[in-house]
Amino acid sequence: VITDNELKKIKDVIQKNIKHLKHHETFGQNDIFNGNAKSSHENDSNFLELIPFLKDRVYAATKEYVKQSGFKVSNEIGNSWFNIQKKDSWLDKHTHPGSIISGALFIKTDSKSSKLFFYNPNPMINFTSINVRNNYNYEWIYFTPKPKTLILFPSWLQHGSNNTLNKSSQRIVVSFNYL
């Protein structure tokens, strides 16, 4: 759980580091990260190092996720960064190669923020007998972002926010990869 005071501290650290961002007009030049959002991904190898209490929370949440899911990981955050999506921005469907678990912590969102989606890459999903479609058996899963929400997922799982353009004035997410 992140308090409102801690959320403000996270926003302050992002604000101090925002000057290093550049608008990536070249997104789409590789298969890893596509879209038109601003990101500290290329500038920050480990953004969480700037916010020790948040790094500790991420470790604790990931440790519990690993315990419940049975993943074998090295107990090390490989890299972390923040993304800022302004109005009409998106992040195309992508994965996080070279890591085991990835996470997205929503810092600033509102009712107009684009949803986070996950895509089930199993082509057989549509050939099984399913009585009821839900988030456990559907090809696409959508999450409405809310501030202070942490979502953990396997790094191989395709995800993004491009199915709907962001209509919020600003959507801020801290992301990380766990090795």
How does the language model describe each region?
Residues 1-69:
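Non-heme Fe(II)/2-oxoglutarate
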Residues 2-3, 85, 106-108, 177-179:
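Solvent-exposed residues in well-ordered beta-strands and their adjoining turns
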Residues 103-105, 168-179:
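A short hydrophobic beta-strand segment most commonly corresponding to one strand
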Residues 43, 48-78, 86-100, 107-111:
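Active-site region of the double-stranded beta-helix
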Residues 83-152, 162:
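Catalytic core of non-heme Fe(II) oxygenases with the double-stranded beta-helix
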Residues 77, 138, 169-173:
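Short edge beta-strand segments in beta-sheet-rich domains
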